[in-house]
A protein has these predicted regions:
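Short beta-strand/loop motif that positions the catalytic acidic residue
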Residues: 103, 108-111, 115
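Catalytic nucleophile-loop/oxyanion-hole region of alpha/beta-hydrolase
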Residues: 1-28, 152-160
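Serine-esterase "nucleophile elbow" of acetyl-processing enzymes
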Residues: 175-210
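Short beta-strand immediately N-terminal to the catalytic nucleophile in serine-hydrolase-like folds
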Residues: 33-35, 110, 185
């Protein structure tokens, strides 16, 4: 596929969030991006590759694919994004642990130790890149849970993870006290997947922007 499409879509989402900040009661300088698994690679790509005006202010990454190094990436993500015969230069460009700078936004990173789909080394090396560049970051590796636990109610560390995430979000000051902290832009969130009365209860509807 065309790897520029998900990147341009995510950049458009960031632009829409910032352009709509007044209407949605958001602080345009306190908007984060969140992604899981392959979506974590997209989120970390936006955090490390985009222009300053489109860059998120923080990133939340659950069991993310970070690297394109074939020795420890998720091969399906590598092949879908870059192709099976990607050059070393292209792999380096999209190995986000190698693209961190001091301008990369702060990060919350979480894995399970027994994740057999995306090796936690992805997040460990990303954390080390952030730490080397003096970017605030936390890395949580829970004892078990495998991969994809973000959508499972039976994840035994669910409450611990939510407490860790809440504490991290509280640990840095929101620039404006009365602003909504996080905006979620994406089909399942904005459209209101699994919400019976989307026209009334979806996020944009509640804010009065539908």
């Amino acid at each position: 596929g065309d790897r520029t499409l998900p990147i341009s879509d995510a950049e458009a989402a960031m632009k829409m969030a910032r352009d709509s900040a007044d209407v949605w009661n958001l602080n345009p300088y306190d908007i984060g991006i969140m992604g899981s698994s392959a979506g974590g690679h997209l989120a970390s790509t936006i955090a490390t590759h985009t222009r300053p005006e489109l860059r998120p202010n923080f990133q939340i990454l659950f069991y993310p694919v970070i690297t394109m190094d074939k020795s420890y990436t998720h091969i399906g993500s590598h092949d879908n994004l870059l192709g099976k015969d990607a050059s070393a230069e292209l792999e380096t460009e999209f190995s986000n642990e190698k693209q961190v700078t001091k301008e990369t936004p702060r990060a919350f990173i979480a894995y399970s130790d027994d994740d057999k789909t995306v090796p936690p080394a992805n997040g460990v090396n990303y954390y080390l890149g952030l730490h080397k560049n003096h970017v605030p970051a936390v890395l949580h590796i829970y004892a078990s849970g495998g991969h994809g636990w973000g959508i499972r109610e039976n994840f035994i560390y669910k409450n611990e993870m939510l407490n860790d995430l809440s504490a991290w979000l509280r640990s840095f000051k929101a620039p404006r006290k009365d602003a909504v902290r996080v905006v979620c832009v994406g089909n399942s969130i904005t459209y209101g997947a699994r919400i019976k009365n989307r026209s009334h209860d979806s996020y944009p509807a509640v804010l009065g922007v539908c």
